[in-house]
Amino acid sequence: MSVCTLLISCAILAAPTLGSLQERRLYEDLMRNYNNLERPVANHSEPVTVHLKVALQQIIDVDEKNQVVYVNAWLDYTWNDYNLVWDKAEYGNITDVRFPAGKIWKPDVLLYNSVDTNFDSTYQTNMIVYSTGLVHWVPPGIFKISCKIDIQWFPFDEQKCFFKFGSWTYDGYKLDLQPATGGFDISEYISNGEWALPLTTVERNEKFYDCCPEPYPDVHFYLHMRRRTLYYGFNLIMPCILTTLMTLLGFTLPPDAGEKITLQITVLLSICFFLSIVSEMSPPTSEAVPLLGIFFTCCMIVVTASTVFTVYVLNLHYRTPETHDMGPWTRNLLLYWIPWILRMKRPGHNLTYASLPSLFSTKPNRHSESLIRNIKDNEHSLSRANSFDADCRLNQYIMTQSVSNGLTSLGSIPSTMISSNGTTTDVSQQATLLILHRIYHELKIVTKRMIEGDKEEQACNNWKFAAMVVDRLCLYVFTIFIIVSTIGIFWSAPYLVA
């Protein structure tokens, strides 16, 4: 029993040894007289056909400012080496072996548009060689490729970047580089949070140079990337729209509140801050202005214009008759036509189309005419009493003497007196008229001051109403402009949601 156990144990231990010997013998036979500088073709006039496939793993980052794309990918090379063919039955049914990179011939295919400091950023893995002579090599790598970033529609932009692979020293007659079937493999692709990948394409090109008649083939693997807009819409666009809409609140704020200018300047500074963020994201190029930058610039123009109009509104609101006269054109436009168009109602004024004055009329309005007519009527009615002024002035001396002599009552005044035209006049009547004249004179002064005060107050109210009209007009105009410009700018984008 012990002898049988010993024989079985020896057989088990000897099996892997024989297998290892077969593999060693295979390596020795394959490497005998093998030169890794020799192209693996039986006829030197034939090209080595190399098939290349890219297995995309992840888009790590897109640096718009430096126009560099960071990608994690595996390169899949296959070609046939006629020097590495064996009969697997002679070598213990070994179907494949591994060789380190550099041990056997490999194509000098490089990434032309690499911006890595080492240029070739692949990890040199082992090559798998099959008994049929097929060589399979899959070097992974983190690639940094240059890509021209088109920021015209940022953040609703689509970028088309590519890998350009080609032989560095072999022309097309010595190395024929071809894209493999299913040239761009995205079965293991990890989705990126910022970029969607709706399409990948492969294209083979042949380029001829003036120095050489041979073609130089290359293979382009294109990445059609579309930016996801949720982040920018939620963190930049919506806050900017809401901030811009706050400028409309400035036109509804009363001028006496004293915060109209403060609000507009605060909004302007906020828009400038958002614009600085966009400028930091965008590459320093003058070829195009990003769509988001156009939107922010438009918002900044709106806020700047609203600040200017706010200053103008405050200037109108605090004008007085001592400093400014309202011209007829300004009066007709701001007090009648625009309020009628905007359906603004002023207490005590009923505006209809029939009552509107001509826009360029220089005649005073009806309210001014009635006010002037009332003043003239009052002066005319009071001037009738002035007919007695001459007689009163003729007899003023007598009245003064009578008062100085102690004649304190009308009964002590002479009953008759000769007037300037030689007629006899009742002295008591003259004294009464004199007192009434003095009362009239004082009332005239008071009335004049009241009328002047009313006119000044009316003029100030006109300026304040004109400021209110400009405020309301700006509210409507800026609201329409903000809505139309926002829709127009974003409607021109190739897409809104990725």
UniProtKB/Swiss-Prot annotation:
State which ranges are Extracellular (membrane side): 20-230
Tissue specificity here reads:
Expressed in the body wall muscle.
- What transmembrane ranges does the database entry give? 231-252, 261-279, 295-314, 473-493
- Which keywords does this chain's UniProt record carry? Cell membrane, Disulfide bond, Glycoprotein, Ion channel, Ion transport, Ligand-gated ion channel, Membrane, Postsynaptic cell membrane, Receptor, Signal, Synapse, Transmembrane, Transmembrane helix, Transport
InterPro entries with a match to the protein in the record: Neur_chan_lig-bd, Neur_chan_lig-bd_sf, Neur_channel, Neuro-gated_channel_TM_sf, Neuro_actylchol_rec, Neurotrans-gated_channel_TM, Neurotransmitter_ion_chnl_CS, Nicotinic_acetylcholine_rcpt
Provide the membrane topology annotation.
Multi-pass membrane protein
Q: Where is the signal peptide?
A: 1-19
Function description: After binding acetylcholine, the AChR responds by an extensive change in conformation that affects all subunits and leads to opening of an ion-conducting channel across the plasma membrane. A subunit of the levamisole-insensitive nicotinic receptor.
| Stated name of the protein | Acetylcholine receptor subunit alpha-type acr-16
In its UniProt entry, the species of origin is given as Caenorhabditis elegans
